[in-house]
Amino acid sequence: MAATVEGPELEAAAAAGDASEDSDAGSRALPFLGGNRLSLDLYPGGCQQLLHLCVQQPLQLLQVEFLRLSTHEDPQLLEATLAQLPQSLSCLRSLVLKGGQRRDTLGACLRGALTNLPAGLSGLAHLAHLDLSFNSLETLPACVLQMRGLGALLLSHNCLSELPEALGALPALTFLTVTHNRLQTLPPALGALSTLQRLDLSQNLLDTLPPEIGGLGSLLELNLASNRLQSLPASLAGLRSLRLLVLHSNLLASVPADLARLPLLTRLDLRDNQLRDLPPELLDAPFVRLQGNPLGEASPDAPSSPVAALIPEMPRLFLTSDLDSFPVTPQGCSVTLACGVRLQFPAGATATPITIRYRLLLPEPGLVPLGPHDALLSHVLELQPHGVAFQQDVGLWLLFTPPQARRCREVVVRTRNDNSWGDLETYLEEEAPQRLWAHCQVPHFSWFLVVSRPVSNACLVPPEGTLLCSSGHPGVKVIFPPGATEEPRRVSMQVVRMAGRELQALLGEPEAAVSPLLCLSQSGPPSFLQPVTVQLPLPSGITGLSLDRSRLHLLYWAPPAATWDDITAQVVLELTHLYARFQVTHFSWYWLWYTTKNCVGGLARKAWERLRLHRVNLIALQRRRDPEQVLLQCLPRNKVDATLRRLLERYRGPEPSDTVEMFEGEEFFAAFERGIDVDADRPDCVEGRICFVFYSHLKNVKEVYVTTTLDREAQAVRGQVSFYRGAVPVRVPEEAEAARQRKGADALWMATLPIKLPRLRGSEGPRRGAGLSLAPLNLGDAETGFLTQSNLLSVAGRLGLDWPAVALHLGVSYREVQRIRHEFRDDLDEQIRHMLFSWAERQAGQPGAVGLLVQALEQSDRQDVAEEVRAVLELGRRKYQDSIRRMGLAPKDPALPGSSAPQPPEPAQA
């Protein structure tokens, strides 16, 4: 690229950006500028806008330290723009020149046009951060090697086949990422980067590492995943500061034993390699991950040829929100859905091309099978076609909400197979502290969700007998003697803890204590042929030498019974210093209690119910600049203060409700009262009430728009929103539901919070659509849903001052936005309606227009309006499907598992 551009050419390019601007146009271009940040990467014609500013040289431009530009521009215009940066933005500290904002027909991100940088950029003396991701760089620009103050360099998703030796001369570099390139070797000079702390070289073609890499004395994180490494240099043991070493998905056959001696190493990821043997130091280390290796297996007779390892790069698909299907060929592919779910189809998974469809469903009680102590962590993913077996297992990664409590609990992926639900072997992958993936292998497609459950241990009991121990509580054991079963049968156990303070408060007895709650289940006949010995820890604080046996009770519960039975007199309790042992012939739930109370069964019912209740508060807030927009949320008690601090910048409203208790999966409703109604036709609105389902780890939040039939010009409307209980989950103790019924009608009421719609002045009266005459308009189609004229009017009424950002993301030119502002400068509503309807008329009849609108709303940080549009589309789709189903024209579609779907199996009762 040329380093300079002549003055007349620069002025001509700037004038092309807006020939009609007068001398004060620079002040109107500064909405792109926020403080010391200039973000032009999402604006059409960003380079022209920057050139225009460079010509005018406003004072604010000299203060810019952070600049973002899209490289999806004309190469010559991009070259001219970059050449002006050293003179016009001399204080620049961060420069982001990224592609990836545009996608191809399959949804994959497109690379930008950038292939080089002007030599003059080395004059940016203050530059510390340079991002060149998603471009077409084949070599590293020479000017980058002269940026002595550069601290972070991002080169991901380019076409680099090598890195220059001079890269090792950057004295301040602390962060370097070169993922998704074509690197085959690394320069030895890389080891001279003494300040480098994070190095990411994943998704390349590296087969060896230079020994000099051990010279990176400050390195904290090293990611070499998804390369072709067959061995590692011993010098890696010299990385004494290393904390994270990721080597999964390589061809490693051996690993240096000295890696176990790195003093600060907290994670060594060796999954999916060719490791058949490991040094004992690594095999026993708790921070090593080894899944997917053939450990202990014999080596093949003929080693595979290195040529065979040169597998063609697997195609990658990135789906946008308007796509719900994708093709898969026998070649395989890696797919990232718009909702964040990832799938990997290995080569040969399908014998013929197949189209995969997906839906992300909101959780509801009939669709989410939860055990008594399970918690839902994700929405429900449906993958179709159902039941089609793949020739190789497909990898599935689901994002989920990190559980609050992890002690004695585990995260699993639950799926439906042959009319029953089961849990898959699940591995967790941590991308960031609050961004976790649940990874599993699936042989066919169905419904999938992520749940947190008590740690489950299982084994196959042979006729010779065996021992089953709990990994969550080592003191819990089950001993199967020889002859307990004739045929091998599978048994499993779960252990649930209860806090001693909660029990003591419930009973009003400071000395009360309980053991962990034990659930035992099995397959096969309900009874064993020989008594099975169960060992439980004594209640906390109690020892076998000091306890009063008259206060020790063994309780037993067999679903679907509603009561806990005291079976202390029916078994022989053998006590040691720390444990109690007893024998049973069938499995169920067992619990040890230590209390002075006599009727322990009823207390156990209350305690078990308390174990499953969540203490929550309900909030109702109105948006400060649009009081008709109401946020409703149900929050765990410990999250209320932090959430309110975050929301009260944009919302205001009454104090949260008093604390109420709810079960996982319990339905509740929000009803607007005293003159206020919901202002939308929503699928979650039943008889004017907004439906919720409480899941403790999900957000439980909805934003709705309200209206009133009262005259707001006469006075403000003082209404309210009340919250009422709905259906309780099936697996709630019957006595809990009965207790609520005995409380009368008020048992369904939980809280009431005030809502106020302020009085409108005469000029602010409702004018939405008043006097507006537009041709009938339907945007979309019957199968994906329509947006009618009234729907678009509703959207227009929500946008307010955010409409220019939405317009730019819709592809409306900046000049057109300015023209609309000027033409309707005294009427904000008319500005919004004119922009939205003129865009809609141009899009009428074109596919993908509705998806483009939703995407623009999300990119403009108006998720609330985007969700309302989705709700309207979903309602339209339902009505359309119902109509064609009534006419007998609907194709057969696998039905959702309804409320009659079997729940996870409970222990059998003898």
Swiss-Prot record:
Give the result of residue 582 to A, as annotated. Loss of the proteolytic cleavage producing PIDD-CC
* Death domain mapped to chain residues: 788-873
Q: What is the effect of changing residue 825 to A?
A: Partial loss of complex assembly with CRADD
Involvement in disorder: Intellectual developmental disorder, autosomal recessive 75, with neuropsychiatric features and variant lissencephaly: An autosomal recessive disorder characterized by global developmental delay apparent from infancy or early childhood, impaired intellectual development, and behavioral and psychiatric abnormalities. Some patients present seizures and facial dysmorphism. Brain imaging often shows cortical anomalies.
Post-translational changes noted in the entry: Undergoes autoproteolytic processing whose extent either directs cells towards survival or apoptotic pathways. Autoproteolytically cleaved into two main fragments PIDD-N and PIDD-C. PIDD-C can be further processed into PIDD-CC, a processing which is enhanced by DNA damage. The cleavage producing PIDD-C is required for translocation of PIDD1 to the nucleus upon DNA damage and activation of NF-kappa-B. PIDD-CC mediates the interaction with CRADD and the cleavage producing PIDD-CC is required for the activation of CASP2. PIDD-N remains associated with PIDD-C and PIDD-CC after cleavage.
- Modified residue Phosphoserine is at which positions? 299, 305
**Source organism of the structure:** Homo sapiens (Human)
Q: What lineage, starting at the top, does this entry show?
A: Eukaryota, Metazoa, Chordata, Craniata, Vertebrata
One GO biological process term is:
protein autoprocessing
- Which spans of this chain does UniProt mark as LRR repeats? 126-147, 149-171, 172-194, 195-216, 218-240, 241-263, 264-285
Pfam families, per the entry: Death, LRR_8, Peptidase_S68, ZU5
Give each disulfide bond as a residue pair: none
Q: What is known of its domains?
A: The Death domain mediates the interaction with CRADD and the formation of a complex composed of 5 PIDD1 and 7 CRADD proteins which in turn recruit 7 CASP2 to form the PIDDosome. The LRR repeat-containing domain has a regulatory activity, being autoinhibitory for the activation of NF-kappa-B.
N-acetylalanine found at: 2
Expression across tissues: Ubiquitous.
* One Gene Ontology molecular-function label: endopeptidase activity
Q: Which InterPro entries does its entry note?
A: DEATH-like_dom_sf, Death_dom, Leu-rich_rpt, Leu-rich_rpt_typical-subtyp, LRR_dom_sf, LRR_domain-containing, Peptidase_S68_pidd, ZU5_dom
Q: How does it assemble?
A: Forms a complex named the PIDDosome with CASP2 and CRADD. Forms a complex with IKBKG and RIPK1. Interacts with FADD and MADD.
Protein name in UniProt: p53-induced death domain-containing protein 1
E.C. number(s) listed in UniProt:
3.4.21.-
UniProt keywords, alphabetically:
Acetylation, Apoptosis, Cytoplasm, Disease variant, Hydrolase, Intellectual disability, Leucine-rich repeat, Nucleus, Phosphoprotein, Repeat
Q: Where is this region: Disordered?
A: 1-25, 884-910
Result after altering residue 862 to A = Loss of complex assembly with CRADD. Loss of PIDDosome assembly. Loss of CASP2 activation
Q: What does this protein do?
A: Component of the DNA damage/stress response pathway that functions downstream of p53/TP53 and can either promote cell survival or apoptosis. Associated with CRADD and the CASP2 caspase, it forms the PIDDosome a complex that activates CASP2 and triggers apoptosis. Associated with IKBKG and RIPK1, it enhances sumoylation and ubiquitination of IKBKG which is important for activation of the transcription factor NF-kappa-B.
The subcellular localization recorded is: Cytoplasm; Nucleus
| Site, as annotated: Cleavage | 445-446, 587-588
Phenotype for residue 828 to E: Loss of complex assembly with CRADD
